[in-house]
Amino acid sequence: MFIDTHTHLYTEEFDADRHEVVSRAFEAGAGALLLPNINAETIDPMLDMCRQWPGRCFPMMGLHPTEFTSDPFPTLQAMHQLLQTNARYIGVGEVGLDFYYDEAPDADLQIQVLQEQTRWAVEFQLPLMIHSRSAHRQLVDTLLPFAPQLPGGVFHCFGGTAGETPG
């Protein structure tokens, strides 16, 4: 069985043909689809997709590093509350650092957001779904203090070298 460890098929771009795309994935041998969240607005569509395909689609909770404003902390608080009250989440994601775009949120703020979400991974013993673009060293430096307590994770996007990987 194959598992698609990272798909955003719940976004509106797939509203017209989501059922066909998901059916093709399952017919091609995907046994499960893991759904990392993007922002506050994508939580409900992500959970709806999990309800439509129970036992095949599994949600994660996280705030993508390019998807927040100058004050992401109310959103983070609401997401943490969802993690506390609902055991259906299988990971914390999509989280990370993305310094590629000039209009990306401030680097220090991205690091604070990543630290907060990494604390969730430790608290709930859930793996991270990590996004890293043009921020390899900073990402490793941010995650290393948590490494002994983290249950693991997947680098969905990582453009660094083997020497830049954590651990």
Which residue ranges define each predicted feature?
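Mid-domain alpha/beta scaffold segments of enzyme catalytic cores
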Residues: 1-167
